[in-house]
Amino acid sequence: MSTVVLVGAQWGDEGKGKVTDFLAEKADLVVRYQGGNNAGHTVVVGDREFKLHLIPSGILYPDKICVIGNGVVIDPAVLIGEMEALAKQGISTANLKISQRAHVIFPYHQRLDQVEENRKGSGKIGTTCRGIGPAYTDKSARIGIRMADLVDEEVFAALLEQNMKDKNHLFTRVYGLPPLDYGSVLESYRGYAKALKGYVTDISIIINEAIKQGKNILFEGAQGTLLDIDHGTYPYVTSSHPVAAAACIGVGIGPTRINRVIGVAKAYITRVGEGPFPTEMKDELGDYIRKKGGEFGTTTGRPRRCGWFDGVAGRYAVRVNGLDYLAVTKLDVLSGLEKVKICTGYLYHGDILNEFPASLKVLRECVPVYDELPGWQEDISGARKLSDLPANARRYLERIGEVTGAPIALIGVGSRRSQTILTAELY
């Protein structure tokens, strides 16, 4: 039996979907523990590409139980759309389980997200405007509506009526917008409730029972460590906790039940939206990496900002998550470069910082200190074991391990499931 938590070790978009898909082969359950449809996974199996936002990547295996935990906020229209899209490709969602305690996203959350982002102007966060933040706000304010409420027709109608009364007061009096129609929202969400009711259950019982039975469980986080509401580059963060500790809270298990934590990082680093980015490439090389790596958001289509691998941020992710291993993806994107760089520290007003600062003012003024290593020209997309990689590529990986303090257990050399090198047993 092994319980493995898979987390993003950067600003999200690290390739967690591919790694989850690869590791799901030996898992009995695959569990999503936080976030919403502001995150996206792209998984390539054979000649087919799957883009998932809420459903765990393990759904592509017919014998896996896939779970959406209570830490997730759910847009039921998006979830049902994903289920229907999978069905059209012959993928069953019969093994999907949804937590009764997961909170629901409503049209007023999405509208609030949009109007607040517009109001902030140049001070905007860079939200996806999917309603994620406002849904988590309602959850913390104890006025949210959960899946257990949604599937109870009488309870749901009363809760929605009160929430929409409050939100419409805000829209009309503060923002000068017309009110949302209660009747149409009620009708739509009653339809969603009927479609999803059979999937809604107490997932904590299912997962704890699976642990007792000695099954392998893979917990997958969305976004990444540097977007965590507490540990990320606040306020340019998400509204939930992508870090490993949140896996326990987000599904209803105790911390002693976790056996291993794996962090996923690209061989370089990217971020979407606003916020400081010390190793960002603001030149033609950044454009080259973006195009070669296909660095455009799965959810928004926005171009991602690209930079050299940040070892300071990597060490931070290892520390706050307690990472046992790193999985390094997209190593193939760096093939063909004469030189490759790894940031080992930050120069700040004449001092070297070896740890990731909390202050955005400090982070914005940090200048990366690089180790420069020779690149490799070979096509590595066909490599299936470590010895298949060129010596310079192996040295680059070794240096990442040295700088971050975490051994590398998995290497991605392409987008397909088969384009993976495993160097350690993870279950």
From Swiss-Prot:
Q: Which SMART domains match?
A: Adenylsucc_synt
Single GO term (MF) = adenylosuccinate synthase activity
Q: Which reaction does it catalyse?
A: IMP + L-aspartate + GTP = N(6)-(1,2-dicarboxyethyl)-AMP + GDP + phosphate + 2 H(+)
Q: Which residues bind GTP?
A: 12-18, 40-42, 304, 330-332, 412-414
What are the BP-aspect GO terms? 'de novo' AMP biosynthetic process; IMP metabolic process
UniProt: substrate binding residues:
298-304
Q: Which residues participate in IMP binding? A: 13-16, 38-41, 128, 142, 223, 238, 302
Q: Which top EC class is given?
A: ligase
| Entry-linked InterPro entries | Adenylosuccin_syn_GTP-bd, Adenylosuccin_syn_Lys_AS, Adenylosuccinate_synth_dom1, Adenylosuccinate_synth_dom2, Adenylosuccinate_synth_dom3, Adenylosuccinate_synthetase, P-loop_NTPase
Catalytic residues (UniProt): 13, 41
Top-rank taxon: Bacteria
Q: Name one Pfam family in it.
A: Adenylsucc_synt
Q: Which cofactor does it need?
A: Mg(2+)
Where it sits in the cell: the answer is:
Cytoplasm
- Which EC number(s) does UniProt give? 6.3.4.4
Biological or metabolic pathway of the protein: Purine metabolism; AMP biosynthesis via de novo pathway; AMP from IMP: step 1/2
Give UniProt keywords alphabetically.
Answer: Cytoplasm, GTP-binding, Ligase, Magnesium, Metal-binding, Nucleotide-binding, Purine biosynthesis
Protein biosynthesis as a keyword of this entry, yes or no, is no
Q: Does the keyword Aminoacyl-tRNA synthetase apply?
A: no
The UniProt note on the cofactor reads as follows: Binds 1 Mg(2+) ion per subunit.
Q: How does it assemble?
A: Homodimer.
Name the family.
Answer: Belongs to the adenylosuccinate synthetase family.
What HAMAP family does this protein's entry cite?
Adenylosucc_synth
Q: What NCBIfam families has UniProt attached to this entry? A: PRK01117.1 (NF002223), purA (TIGR00184)
Record-given protein name = Adenylosuccinate synthetase
- Source species of the chain: Pelotomaculum thermopropionicum (strain DSM 13744 / JCM 10971 / SI)
